[in-house]
Amino acid sequence: MLFPGVPLPLHIFEPRYKEMIAECLDLKTPFGILRASSEGVADIGCTAEILEVTKKYDDGRMDILTRGVDRFEVLEVHEDRAFLQAEITLIQDEPGRPPRQMVEQAVRLHAEIAKLSGTEVSGPAEGASNLSFLLAGSLPLDLDFKQKLLVTSSEAKRLEAVVGYLEAILPGLRRAAKARWN
C-alpha cells in the first residue's frame, strides 16, 4: 500500500518490474501501485515517483526509494506488455480541513502508539494537508483499513477514521506494553 506523501522503499527483482522501472527512469514518469488481495486488484491506487535508485545489483535487480504522489482510479487496464498498464484518472480531495482538535488528537494518539510499539517515527507536521496518510502510512495498520482511507476523498473523514482506529487499538497496545514491563 502506498499513500500520497509517504516514502516506500522497493526491491525490484522480477524481470517485468525491472523493465517497468527502467522505462519510468528513462521517461521520468511515475508508476502506479494498487492493492492486490484474494478478492482481486483494487480500483483505487497511488502513483509513485522514483526518488532515487539506492542500489544496483549485477543481475539487474535494484533497490529504489519512491514516494506516493496522487491517488488515482483505474478506468481501463491494458495487458499487452509484461507489466500491466492502465488509463487512469487522478482523484482530488474535497475542499476543507479537519478541525484542529482532531488533528491534535490524531498526532497525540500516533505518538503514543509509536512509543508503545517501539516504532521510531518522526511526528508529521500537524499542518500537512495529507496528515491522515502520513500517520497511517507510518504504522503497520490493517490493509483493508488503509484501502478504505485511500478511497476516501475527504481529509477530515480520513483523519476521523484514523483517530477511531488508533483509539480502538490503543488499549490492547497498552496492555501488551504493561505485560512486557512486568
Give short role names for the model-derived ranges.
Residues 1-182:
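N-terminal low-complexity, acidic/polar interaction/targeting segments
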